[in-house]
A protein has these predicted regions:
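N-terminal maturation segment of proteins
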Residues: 1-119
Length: 119
């Protein structure tokens, strides 16, 4: 769990750093080399995976941060449903319902999940 969170955090740093021209930890503008270095050292990726991740974020600006925002909305909706439904909450039913909703923006998605009755 923690290693996955470290990777997600590193992806956000890389994505934002490379696309907004921020300085890396060595005081240089973020580039593919500094991205791979961070992913190797902080997210513990091997060279092949750090290269692949770097290419991914060079070609898909904003993907890392949008993924993390979506994850937070999903997790909050799930925690709210657990609190609202108590012992009636079913993780499997929650996920089934959430996936059946289909694609939509995060605000309508959160509102839809807030109205879920557990069935």
């Amino acid at each position: 769990y923690l290693s996955a969170q470290a990777l997600r955090a590193a992806r956000i740093v890389v994505d934002i750093g490379m696309h907004l021209g921020f300085k890396d930890f060595d005081g240089k503008v973020w580039n593919a080399e500094s991205s791979r270095k961070l992913l190797n050292e902080q997210a513990l990726l091997d060279e092949e995976h750090s290269r692949s991740e770097t290419d991914r974020y060079l070609g898909w600006p904003g993907q890392a941060i949008s993924y993390k925002v979506g994850e937070r909305v999903w997790m909050k909706a799930r925690e709210d449903a657990k609190a609202r439904l108590g012992s009636e909450f079913s993780l499997k039913k929650f996920h089934t319902y959430a996936l059946k909703i289909g694609p939509m923006g995060l605000d309508p998605f959160a509102a839809e999940l807030a109205n879920w009755d557990g069935n």
